[in-house]
């Protein structure tokens, strides 16, 4: 190696690199995670929107199967025809929400505020709903088979 020390630095560095023992480094991973710009974007991309402010949101016909909407504020939201099968709506505020024809099969509704909500023709099979606020709730034509709705007061 001493005989080739007169080579330019770049070539010298290459020769040294190939004659040196290999060193493997772990790859560097950069996570540039951008925060969601809106609660709707968060819900659409992650399926989770705990404590989100979705008041008056238009979620008509949305596919929210298994969504995590615990403590979300959905007052006055349009969820007509939405599929919320298996969704967790524990302690969510759905007062005056429009849920006509929505599917809430196997949904978790404990502590949910459904006052003056419109659940006409909704499918609420096997939903678990203790301490639900139901004053003025409309549910004519709804399928409540196997659901446990326990009125929690006003």
Please place each PLM-identified region on the residue numbering:
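Tandem repeat scaffolds
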Residues: 26-154
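Bacterial N-terminal signal peptides that target proteins for export
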Residues: 2-11
